[in-house]
Amino acid sequence: RRQRQMCIRDSNVAAKEYFASQISKNPKGKRINDYILNRGISAEVIKEFEIGFAPEGWTNLFDYFTNSNKKEFINDEVGLFKKSEKNKVYDGFRNRIIFPIKSKKGHVIGFGGRVIDEEMPKYLNSPENEVFKKGKELYGLHEVLKNNRSLKKVIVVEGYTDVLSLFSKNIKYAVATLGIATSKNHLEKLFSHVDEVIFCFDGDEAGMKAAESAMKICLPIIRDGKSLKFLFLPNNEDPSSLLEKEGKEEFEKRIESSRVLSDYLFELVLNKYDDSIENKAAASKEFMSLISSMPGSNYKNILIQEFSKKVDIKLEEEVKVISKRKQIKVSEEKEFDYELDK
């Protein structure tokens, strides 16, 4: 297994070097470099993140490995190549800007590719293998840790270019998920390094849904001393466009004024209901359902107290009832296990 993992990593390093060389060698690669620079991403950041280019054509990387005595890297496990119906091998990444994805320690474990023409899917990631699991990795985390000796917070943005734009403006604490929703693994990894995680979303309906999903995933692992915040951008804006319009200082003000979890949670629930007794009861039920996944903590107790004030209902008794139900359930499960053992 160790040998397979080393082969995958070595293959990725060789591919990364090839893709990086095409930015300067390939005529279209030079145009791609200009395209990236025009989006406000600095040459220094392009170099630090080792951005590359996969040229047009079906076998550029395949031919490079073949002609460079690197045939051992042409295998199914790595995920750099695909096979046609006629069993012919061709490049998986073609005519795309290439973003090497690195582990926390800096090993290249996969790639993200952004299409230039809109005929193909916009983003393409390496398939998962022994060293690359999308639900566990975060783009930019290696660079964030490398650039910050005393890291206090991390902002999670939506895409690779958002991370690069923020780094280019010296906001070097940005990461992105790999084209998937935030997972429990992502959050646990971030909270192992920082006490404050800020999610940055578009202000549209999709962004609101993504924020709610992230919150629900976070609730079971939030604990005293850890903070979750939400930053919603104006419609039709992303970090790159806002940085261009407002500059670093104003964007960091937005980060500082992000909504804390308690405010976001209360607003999410209460905005669905009016002030009638029936709806206050319904809001309380939804709120208790949401926080039921949270571990016991001072923070959870304070959330309950503050929400109780907002709906003018004492929820402490409800908490005791829920807690008692859980104890009974655990007790019954233990009794059932005992009966099975007999």
Spans of features found by a protein language model:
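Amphipathic alpha-helical interaction segments
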Residues: 10, 14, 31-35, 60, ...
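Extended, non-catalytic structural segments that build the interaction scaffolds
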Residues: 13-24, 58, 151, 287-295
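Phosphate-handling DNA/RNA-contact segment within nucleic-acid enzymes
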Residues: 14-15, 57-193, 210-211
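A charged alpha-helical hairpin associated with nucleic-acid processing machineries
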Residues: 103-104, 145-153, 183-197, 203-342
